[in-house]
């Protein structure tokens, strides 16, 4: 059939090929996964994450408007209470722009 050295070489290469074939298959699968499946999955996830239903966006705008209104009311209250505390502290003879807890007169009762 052939020389014994050629047969040995063929057998050795076949056994080596049978060992390396699963590794090659795994590498190929890995590349396929990297090149095709992962990018499309990531893109799909990005579109899902960025998608907002029109009703949701309206609700979001309403929430933002509400937050701005609350912030305006809060800052207005802080401004007014700052003025009131300054006037009150000036009436009581304390210096500074706000009353401290121990600056208040003690309850005689």
Swiss-Prot record:
Keywords: Meiosis, Mitochondrion
Assigned GO CC terms: mitochondrion
GO terms classed as biological process: meiotic cell cycle
Subcellular location per the Swiss-Prot or TrEMBL entry: Mitochondrion
Its biological purpose: Has a role in meiosis.
Name used for this protein in its record: Meiotically up-regulated gene 153 protein
